[in-house]
Amino acid sequence: MKRLPLLLTLLTLCIPGSPLVAADYDLVIRGGRIVDGTGNPWFNGDVAILDDRIAAVGQVSGTADHEINAAGLVVAPGFIDIHSHSDFLLLEDGHAQSKIRQGVTTEILGEGNSAGPYRGKLSAQSRKVRGKDREWRTLGGYFDVLDQAGTSVNVASYVGLNNVWQSVMGSSFDRPSPEQITEMAKLVDEAMRDGALGLSSQVMMPPGSLATTEDVIALCRVVAKHGGLYSTHIRNEGTGVFEAVNEAIEIGRQAGVPVDIIHLKIADQTFWGRMNEIVEQINAARTEGLNIQANVYPYTRGNNNLVSIIPPWAHEGGRQKLLERLRDPEQRKRMKHDIENGIDGWYNHYTAVGRDWSRMLVSANTTF
């Protein structure tokens, strides 16, 4: 009879539906080398997750529904890809395996070209995206479509100068009127209200190269009102690189916006070894109180569309006009002359590599 209370207790614990003791955490990653992103040296420890949030870091006691043994591995915050062209690829496959498996958890989109706006003349010219009907006209509309489709990565985007410019100007090389600049400013304002980080430009080739410094300043003043920033693929990465960096600095100065220079480099071999001078330009601007920075990529190659090697004048009127010019023997002769000899103010990939075609690789594969 003395054993009855114990027996009753065991039976009670075995009755289906009895409440179980809840784990302290959903997940604990144990024994990894923790690099916390603050600049501190790495340390061995655990990371506990509860309700999709980091709940504890260090030597974590307690239980978890799932545990991962990270011995010999690095545990770090998700990486941010600050220059991504996955805007439309994420709509095709939101799993983003190529990024997730590298530890990338956030992608920054919209460099020069963005997923919106598609207004006015640009909307009429670009009814399809990667062969599918485009379902939106604004950057906010794109965000809504992406939300519905779902994605494994966090996403943020700039509004691209090319979209803004072509929405108003189409394929024209004409100078915009004051009224058209005002229309562009309204599109930038709309995108900023939709959640854009700021304005991003690609002013090395049309249509972005059609914008003057004053044009970009006018649009960046709208960005400044929303606390955004200006990110730029500068106008020239060759022998005009110093002037191009100064232009980016001046835009930040006049518009009152932080500036980020994208993949800063000196591509023309005649100027190799002079990067310290550009660093001095940037440091001088920072000493002045301007908020300016630059980023680089860790390899000695660049990538661009093949059309970037064709002189700017040949792009006027859009792709169909360009194809017509390419079919014209006299126009091709003029293009060849300009490619081989250069045009003042135009960054020329061919002359930048020492007029050596063997240093240029042409690929038909989709690269991003």
Report residues per predicted region.
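Histidine-rich, glycine-flanked metal-binding segment
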Residues: 23-27, 34-78, 93
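Divalent metal-coordination and catalytic microenvironments
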Residues: 32, 47, 52, 72, ...
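Alpha-helix-loop-beta-strand connector modules within alpha/beta enzyme cores
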Residues: 213-232, 255
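Sec/Tat signal peptide C-region and signal peptidase I cleavage site
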Residues: 18-22
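Metal-associated gating/positioning segment near the N- to mid-region
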Residues: 62, 67-137
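Active-site neighborhoods of metal-dependent hydrolases
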Residues: 143-152, 158-178, 184-205, 210, ...
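Histidine-centered catalytic micro-motifs
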Residues: 79-89, 201, 230-236
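Bacterial N-terminal signal peptides
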Residues: 5-17
